[in-house]
Amino acid sequence: MEDRNLERNIGSDISSSSSIDMSQSTNLEISIDQSINRNLEKIDISEDDVRRGEKKIESFENGENNNNNNNNNNNNNNNNNNNNNKNEDRKFKKTLFCIKMYIIQYFKKWLGTGKDKRPPIPDLEEIGWTWLASFTGILVLALIHYREALDAQMQVLIGSFAASAVIIFGVPKSPLAQPRNLIMGHFLSAVVGSVIRVALVYTNANFEVACALAVSLSIMLMQFTNSLHPPGGATALICVMGVEQRWRGFYFIFVPILSGALIMLLTALVVNNFARKRSYPLYWW
């Protein structure tokens, strides 16, 4: 019984002490709030001050953002400059490499593609027919030239016909030896040479330019008309370089060029087809 009474007394003391502590803490909090409110009432802050403070904060934040942006831009510019420099270096090295390879490939062409593509040597029969056909063709022109043409102050035999003899009698199967190329090649080249002679030579123009222009234009015209015949370039040059008065104007186109080319064609038709292994022409036009 005594123990129970003791426990009751102790419990009542603890409860009374706890209630006292709670009331004291509540009073302390109230006093702190009142002091804070009194201090806040003493501070006089206007709306303008608040706005100015907000602006300062915003400007400070914007300044930091601008600084960050500037730093980022500078870094980006540096990176771009570095990338541009690297790209320029790559382009320069690539250009040097391309030039180097072009030079190497260019001089490799001087070495040729190999002896395996060289045409075989013709047999004795083919060589014999080439000699006979070329001898006959030039002989016919020479006879007409020295026996008939000179007496009439005409010319039938010129140097470019010797080059034509090599083609139409030496390689009669070549596209350059066919009748279209033989006739049109000489004819067009003679026209070009005559025009250049009249336009430049007889107007006291540059004679060197006239020679080069006659040959180059004749080659271009033959290629354009698919009638390329290498001796035609010589025909154009002879036309420009001739000093005989009878060559003045366009008479040179018909005599000796067109007439001589027809005589060469007739000789090729007769002699080439006598050969067992030859058939001329492959086509006419």
Swiss-Prot record:
Keywords assigned by UniProt, alphabetized: Membrane, Transmembrane, Transmembrane helix
Keyword Transmembrane: yes
Bias type Low complexity, positions: 12-25, 65-85
Protein localization: Membrane
Keyword Transferase attached: no
Broad class of the protein's primary localization: membrane
Coiled-coil intervals: none
Region Disordered, annotated ranges: 1-25, 59-87
Bilayer-spanning residue ranges: 124-144, 152-172, 182-202, 205-225, 250-270
One GO location term (cellular component): membrane
Membrane topology label: Multi-pass membrane protein
PANTHER family: TRANSMEMBRANE PROTEIN DDB_G0269096-RELATED
Protein name: Transmembrane protein DDB_G0269096
Phylogenetic lineage: Eukaryota, Amoebozoa, Evosea, Eumycetozoa, Dictyostelia
